[in-house]
Curated annotation (Swiss-Prot):
Keyword Oxidoreductase listed: yes
UniProt name for this protein: NADPH-dependent 7-cyano-7-deazaguanine reductase
Function field: Catalyzes the NADPH-dependent reduction of 7-cyano-7-deazaguanine (preQ0) to 7-aminomethyl-7-deazaguanine (preQ1).
Record GO biological process: queuosine biosynthetic process; tRNA modification
Family matches, as InterPro entries: GTP-CH-I_C/QueF, NADPH_dep_7-cyano-7-deazaG_red, QueF, QueF_type1
Amino acid sequence: MPNTDVSSLSMLGQQTETAQSPEEAVLEKVPSNHAGTDYVVRFTAPEFTSLCPMTGQPDFAHIVIDYIPGEWLVESKSLKLFLHSFRNHGAFHEDCSIYIAKRIVELLDPRWLRIGAYWYPRGGIPIDVFWQTGKPPEGVWLPEQGVATYRGRG
C-alpha cells in the first residue's frame, strides 16, 4: 500500500510566503513508494532568475534537474519556492547551480542526481553549468536534457 502520510509537510496545501534567501528556504521531502526501483524524476525550471552579485542586474537560466530517488522524493511545492527564493539573491551562475544541486542531495540522499543550468548571456557570453553526483546506475533510461545550446543569431 502506498505511503501517503504528508503530516510532516508544512507548505503543501497552505498559503506560503517565499523565503527571502535560498539559505532560509525550506526544502521538504516525502517518502518514495518505489524505493529500490531505479527511475528518473525530472524538474524543469525554464524561467529561473537570480541577481548578479556585482551589478544587481537579473540573470536568467533554464534549469533541468534529474535524479534517481532512494527512499525520498523532493516535495515539488517546496522546490518551487526554494528556486523562487533566488529571485532577489546575488550569486554567480556557478554558485547558484551547484548550491541548488547540493541542497537537494543533502535533503534526499538520492541514488544519483545531475543538474544542467543553461544561463542566458550576460556580457555576450552564455554560461552553462553541469554537475552530477557520479555515474548513473546501469540500465536507467536517462533522456537528454533537451536544452539547445545558445546560438544568438548564428
